[in-house]
UniProtKB/Swiss-Prot annotation:
It comes from Salmonella schwarzengrund (strain CVM19633). One of its GO terms (biological process) is arginyl-tRNA aminoacylation. The keyword Lipid metabolism does not apply. InterPro entries: DALR_anticod-bd, Gly-tRNA-synth_bsu, Gly-tRNA-synth_heterodimer. This is Glycine--tRNA ligase beta subunit. It is found in: Cytoplasm. Belongs to the class-II aminoacyl-tRNA synthetase family.
Length: 689
């Protein structure tokens, strides 16, 4: 069967830069699935993405599906014909579905009986006939939150479409995709190269687009070029470029032909906190800031143009003129804000609503102040500093700088607090209260900051759950999932002695009578334990390990973590599988027991050697392990419990649990319950697979 290279390129208006990669990857994944489902043999499926195009190139695509033999078994002969030998309705219906008559059907004989059988040789469809619908289906499944319609057409897509190139080798596959007739025409760069040209063969892509159209269609190659050129440009001025992955991705999605240039701004602006300047450069202008080797911001920035200019100084000058007013604004706001102390902004917090049922930002501040102080007392942080940090926590939201540059919240609070002479751990806490902002983000660095960060997040969790507005589906307007995971990470990774039960109760208590959900504490704890499940799955723990610990519902996050590590280690022991199975057996036996058990195992009632030996082991281990459980030394405890494998195996091998004599039966059930209780001090290992 012959094979050829296949190319599809969808030429569009400028695609959303933050979605470009996901659109291209989804297009490739969807189309690959279509090929596989159709049984079309193919090689590598390569995706390309630039601001005005999505493309796929498939190596060694078969020109048709393979022929195949089809067999359809019909009714058994006994049901296929009546007593007179006439076909039954069931047989006739089956035959019609196969496109034959009953007398054309074959017979299938086996040891189990005889059936009607239809056999056919089905010729594979051509790739040319299959591909158009496969492309259309793949595009329809793209993750596009909001579709556009353009002109008088009813066609919807993420952006208006201008060209559709569909080639199998050197042949155009005729089709209408997104309202456009397929062709071999490709559009180049808007301002360089050939604006439009034809491609003779799919193998020429993407090189022909690079040479004639001045477009680097390879997304990763374009991104790598920007990174390498920006690093070199920074080195030339003695600095290091801040090439954050997210901004690199966005810039790579904005340009077709990247040209890296270096510009500068006035040194006087360096008196403004670097975070505000960087916010403007990265967030508004998509520039890369440059730092010296000591990490200090330099009065330079690197940007990426989408054109090769005969006079790049004009482009540089233009970008410098664009950024200067924004930096001047930041300077003005910074100088104006410092004329007031942070504390002076407290009254204005009363004018900003946190949530209609939960009050204003001033109300939230009062709660955070009290809760941060309470948490500080629990974890050994400075209570006065934590309370002070809570009082000032939202004041920077009322400053000119944060109002204009919203992403500087927290960090500007830190700078203004330092200017006001606040304690350093208070100032740092104002910045770190929002950490961790995302997965893998840094945690608050000092105990006061930890107390404030936990207080802020727990206040939101208790309040929103307290009025019954918990997250539903993908909707989470108050970022409660992030808040819950942030609290858990801080407590676990900082090894803080905090209990979710008392923590949530205190957070809810501070709302007074504003909360309407009587189950708010349990709801918040269940929600947070659910985030634990997601966290540990991401960390690579198995679902049954997580379930085994969750079954005990530990509400101290640091304790939960210790149990997780203990059970995970226990699974590596040779005895683990047998003991998990034994615990499952014990659990099932106890679940079926209807008689009340004894408080203790009565040694005088023990008869068999195996039950006497098991009881002896349990007594020894119970006394030995109590300090382990009290100190949270769960891994050591489970290692000790692994020694029970032999006596447990002996017990089930030689002892009849449900003995006829009631006192013996109840004593043996009590013995098993004591065995299970020991393991349940750590986790329900009966859930381990």
């Amino acid at each position: 069967m012959s094979e050829k290279t296949f190319l599809v390129e969808i030429g569009t208006e400028e695609l959303p830069p933050k979605a470009l990669r996901s659109l291209a990857e989804s297009f490739a994944a969807n189309f690959t699935a279509e090929l596989d489902n159709a049984g079309l043999a193919h090689g590598n499926v390569e995706w390309f993405a630039a601001p005005r195009r999505l493309a796929l190139k498939v190596a060694n695509l078969a020109e048709s599906q393979p022929d195949r033999e089809v067999e359809k078994r019909g009714p058994a002969i006994a049901q296929a014909f009546d007593a007179e030998g006439k076909p039954s309705k069931a047989a006739e219906g089956w035959a019609r579905g196969c496109g034959i008559t009953v007398d054309q059907a074959e017979r299938l004989k086996t040891d189990k009986g005889e059936w009607l059988l239809y056999r056919a040789h089905v010729k594979g469809e051509s790739t040319e006939a299959l591909v158009p619908n496969m492309v259309a289906t793949s595009l329809a499944k793209l993750p596009i939150p909001k579709l556009m319609r353009w002109g008088a057409s009813d066609v919807h897509f993420v952006r208006p479409v201008h060209t559709v190139t569909l080639l199998l080798g050197d042949k155009v596959i005729p089709a209408t995709i997104l309202g456009i007739q397929s062709d071999r025409v490709i559009r180049g760069h808007r301002f360089m190269g050939e604006p439009e040209f034809t491609i003779d063969n799919a193998d020429q892509y993407p090189q022909i687009l690079l040479e004639r159209g001045k477009v680097i269609a390879d997304y990763e190659a374009r991104k790598a070029k920007i990174k390498a050129d920006a690093e070199e440009a920074a080195r030339k001025i003695g600095g290091n470029a801040d090439l954050s992955e997210s901004l690199l991705e966005e810039v790579a999605s904005l340009v077709e032909w990247p040209v890296v240039l270096t510009a500068k701004f006035e040194e006087k602006f360096l008196a403004v906190p670097a975070e505000a300047l960087v916010y403007t450069m990265k967030g508004d202008q998509k520039y890369f800031p440059v730092y010296d080797n000591a990490g200090k911001l330099l009065p330079n920035f690197i940007f990426v143009a989408n054109i090769e200019s005969k006079d790049p100084t004009q482009i540089i000058s233009g970008n410098e003129k664009v950024v200067r007013p924004r930096l001047a604004d930041a300077e003005f706001f910074f100088n104006t804000d410092r004329k007031k102390r942070l504390e002076d902004h407290l009254p204005r917090l009363q004018t900003v609503l946190f949530q209609q049922q939960l009050g204003t930002l001033r109300d939230k501040t009062d709660r955070i102040q009290a809760l941060a102080g309470w948490i500080a007392g629990q974890i050994g942080a400075d209570v006065n500093h934590a309370t002070r940090a809570g009082l000032l926590s939202k004041c920077d939201l009322m400053t000119n700088m944060v109002f204009e540059f919203t992403d500087t919240q927290g960090v500007m609070g830190m700078h203004y607090a330092r200017h006001d002479g606040e304690a350093e751990d208070v100032a740092v806490a104002l910045n770190e209260q929002y950490q961790p902002r995302f997965a893998g983000d840094d945690l608050p660095s000092n105990p006061v900051a930890c107390a404030l960060a936990i207080a802020d997040k727990m206040d939101t969790l208790a309040g929103i759950f307290g009025i019954g507005q918990h997250p539903k589906g993908d909707k989470d307007p108050f970022a409660l999932r992030r808040a819950a995971l942030g609290v858990l990470r801080i407590i676990v990774e900082k090894n803080l002695n905090l209990d979710l039960q008392t923590l949530t109760e205190e957070a809810a208590r501070l709302y007074g009578d504003k909360l309407t959900n009587a189950n708010v504490v349990d709801d918040v704890i269940d929600f947070m334990l659910g985030r634990f499940r997601a966290w540990y799955q991401d960390e690579g723990y198995t679902v049954d390990t997580i379930q085994a610990v969750l079954a005990r519902r530990p509400t101290r996050p640091a304790d939960f973590d210790a149990r997780m590590k203990a059970v995970s280690h226990f699974r590596t022991l040779e005895e683990a599988s047998a003991l998990a199975a034994a615990n499952k057996r014990v659990s099932n036996i106890l679940a079926k027991a209807t008689e009340p058990l004894n408080d203790i195992v009565h040694a005088s009632v023990l008869k068999e050697a195996a039950e006497i030996e098991l009881a002896r082991h349990l007594v020894v281990l119970r006394d030995k392990l109590q300090p382990y459980f009290a100190d949270g030394r769960y891994q050591e405890a489970l290692i000790e419990l692994a020694a029970l494998r032999a006596p447990v195996d002996e017990f089930f091998e030689n002892v009849m649990v449900n003995a006829e004599e009631k006192d013996i039966r109840i004593n043996r059930l009590t013995l098993l319950s004591k065995l299970r209780e020991l393991f349940l001090q750590v986790a329900d290992i009966s859930l381990l697979q």
